[in-house]
Amino acid sequence: MALNIENIVAELENATILELSELVKAIEEKFDVTAAAPVAAAAGAGEAAAAKDSFDVELTAAGDKKVAVIKEVRGITGLGLKEAKELVDGAPTVVKEGLSESEANEIKEKLEAAGASITLK
């Protein structure tokens, strides 16, 4: 049985997305490979960190003044009392994400003033 590339390509053109997905999975399992794109070199990671323009504010601990922290979280996020309490109780958790550096620092200062431990990511 000769392998005819043109016939294979023609069959793939007529296949559905579901069939193609199953084919990829079967090839990955059979040949122990992955279809994922290769990751960029580590040198590019340093440049990406220097040019970071989006920050997440993470509450790592509520501290001793939990009520003040919950009040501040409500003001920052617009959450209700129950949701804000659950967020604070679930620390470490992200309070707000996708912020500019100045916005993230402003929120960090407010929460730290209320007694929380904060990290910016």
From Swiss-Prot:
Q: Which residues form a coiled coil?
A: none
UniProt record, GO biological process: translation
User: By its UniProt entry, which CDD domains does this protein fall under?
Assistant: Ribosomal_L7_L12 (cd00387)
Specify the signal sequence span.
Answer: none
Q: Name one Pfam family in it.
A: Ribosomal_L12_N
Q: Does the keyword Zinc apply?
A: no
A single GO cellular-component term on record: cytosolic large ribosomal subunit
The alphabetized UniProt keywords are: Ribonucleoprotein, Ribosomal protein
GO molecular function per UniProt = mRNA binding; structural constituent of ribosome
Q: Which HAMAP family match?
A: Ribosomal_bL12
Q: What does this protein do?
A: Forms part of the ribosomal stalk which helps the ribosome interact with GTP-bound translation factors. Is thus essential for accurate translation.
Its quaternary organisation is: Homodimer. Part of the ribosomal stalk of the 50S ribosomal subunit. Forms a multimeric L10(L12)X complex, where L10 forms an elongated spine to which 2 to 4 L12 dimers bind in a sequential fashion. Binds GTP-bound translation factors.
Family per UniProt?
Belongs to the bacterial ribosomal protein bL12 family.
Question: What is the name of this protein?
Answer: Large ribosomal subunit protein bL12
The organism named in the record is Lactococcus lactis subsp. cremoris (strain MG1363)
**Gene behind this chain?**
rplL
